[in-house]
Design a protein with these regions (language model features):
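Short, conserved beta-strand element in jelly-roll/cupin
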Residues: 88-106
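Short beta-strand segments in beta-sandwich/barrel cores
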Residues: 77-78, 102-107, 130
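Ligand-binding loop in jelly-roll beta-barrel domains
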Residues: 125-150
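Short acidic-glycine-tyrosine-enriched beta hairpin
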Residues: 108-127
Length: 161
């Protein structure tokens, strides 16, 4: 009787180990996977791609909205890199989306400072300067309605406390 109990206990342990293996599959890595491009930085299928002020911008349409992936390089600052191309002292766009990677510092004309660190949903009001914090590029997935973003998203037209 003791032998049959030992056999039953051994079968139970093996069955439990098999269930555990099925519940937590091992990740398989291959040499090919190791050289893959990071999906946050890979080209977006079907998007229009352009660079402006050192920012890599990819834009696609989703109904009436545009979906944009913006990659800001380490060292980027709006007032240095974009101001000459845009011609305004501050960024006058509203930004609504998801900060997928990196950290950004936002400063408004009234001196108010906001910092965002990934992963985070962001809503940045018009009238700001901003820059990348640290040595990692910033990746933002943004939704906009071209010149109608503020109204369509319910954002204020200027920074408020």
């Amino acid at each position: 009787m003791a032998k049959s109990m030992k056999k039953a206990a051994a079968r139970s342990r093996r069955a439990g180990a098999a269930r555990k293996r099925r519940a937590t599959p091992r990740m398989k890595t291959s040499k090919r996977a190791a050289g893959k491009i990071d999906p946050l930085l890979a080209p977006v299928k079907g998007a229009e791609r352009r660079n402006i002020g050192h920012v890599q911008l990819e834009v696609g349409r989703a109904g009436e909205a545009r979906v944009k992936r913006m990659i800001y390089p380490a060292g980027f600052r709006w007032s240095t890199d974009m101001k000459p191309a845009v011609g305004t002292d501050l960024c006058m766009h509203a930004h609504v989306g998801f900060l997928a990677r990196g950290e950004i510092h936002i400063e408004y004309a009234d001196g108010c400072v906001v910092e965002h660190k990934a992963p985070q949903i962001v809503a940045i009001e018009p009238g700001h300067d901003g820059w990348v914090v640290g040595n990692e590029p910033v990746v933002i997935i943004e939704f906009d309605f071209e010149g109608d973003t503020v109204r369509r998203t319910g954002m204020p037209t200027a920074h408020r406390h």
